From Swiss-Prot:
It is an enzyme of class 2 (transferase). This is tRNA (guanine-N(7)-)-methyltransferase. PANTHER family: 3-DEOXY-D-MANNO-OCTULOSONIC-ACID TRANSFERASE/TRNA GUANINE-N 7 - -METHYLTRANSFERASE, PENTACOTRIPEPTIDE-REPEAT REGION OF PRORP DOMAIN-CONTAINING PROTEIN. Catalyzes the formation of N(7)-methylguanine at position 46 (m7G46) in tRNA. It comes from Lacticaseibacillus paracasei (strain ATCC 334 / BCRC 17002 / CCUG 31169 / CIP 107868 / KCTC 3260 / NRRL B-441). S-adenosyl-L-methionine binds at E44, E69, D96, D118. GO terms for cellular component: tRNA methyltransferase complex. NCBIfam families: PRK00121.2-2, tRNA (guanosine(46)-N7)-methyltransferase TrmB. It comes from the Bacteria. Belongs to the class I-like SAM-binding methyltransferase superfamily. TrmB family. It holds the Pfam family Methyltransf_4. Its EC number is 2.1.1.33.
Length: 214
């Protein structure tokens, strides 16, 4: 979902280079230097307004987190929260998920989250889906062997597409849930803003957890 431009977004981003990087091509292999100490490194691609990644950083102080978001207005909303919270294990990136191998080195990421990505339902836009094979190839390159990819969506079509895409890519599924909020196997779900609204209206949430075969 596109957010309206916010006049305060760019000045806020420019004022906090210690918390946010813009298209960080020179950070490959050096991400731990952005945190107060080295910890396992987790990446969310498409962080939206940031409720999920902020809560994860608060809940798991033993991990480092990176929130990557393409929209300036959205990442600025996360930055507003981080300016107030000053979480030592959270860094923000204004950048494109299509450029991950420019931002991260091979095997640098311990886990990756895709939450409520744009479904791009038209066939001609298939290559823009974050579970298209070209994206999967980048995830595989930057993730450690057996690192987990967690994917959540409310869009049944995108979920089914993602299952097929990942299966064709040779991934192994650790969890497939057709109704996440009623799945007793999942006890540690952290919802996004959108997820809370959608499920409160009776919507169904789909989730899969998978890893690459090496």
């Amino acid at each position: 979902m596109r957010l309206r431009n916010k006049q305060w977004a760019k000045p806020l981003i420019l004022a906090h280079p210690e918390m946010i990087l813009v298209r960080p091509e020179k950070m490959q292999g050096h991400w731990q230097s952005r945190f107060d100490q080295a910890r396992p490194l987790y990446l969310e691609v498409g962080s939206g307004k940031g409720q999920f990644i902020v809560e994860m950083a608060k809940t798991h102080p033993d991990r480092n987190f990176i929130a990557l978001e393409l929209q300036e207005a959205a990442v600025a909303m996360i930055l507003k929260k981080q300016v107030a919270l000053k979480l030592p294990n959270l860094q923000l990136v204004l950048g494109d998920g299509a450029d991950l191998t420019d931002y991260f080195s091979e095997g640098e990421i311990d886990g990756l989250f895709l939450n409520f990505s744009d479904p791009w339902p038209k066939t001609r836009h298939e290559k823009r889906r974050l579970t298209y094979r070209d994206f999967l190839r980048q995830y595989q390159a930057i993730m450690k062997p057996d690192a987990l990819l967690q994917f959540k969506t409310d869009n049944q079509g995108l979920f089914e597409y993602s299952l097929v895409s990942m299966n064709h890519f040779g991934m192994t599924f650790d969890l497939v849930s057709l109704n996440l909020h009623h799945d007793k196997r999942v006890t540690d779900n952290v919802p996004t803003e959108y997820e809370e609204k959608f499920s409160a209206d009776g919507g169904r949430i789909y989730e899969l957890v998978a890893h690459f075969k090496h």
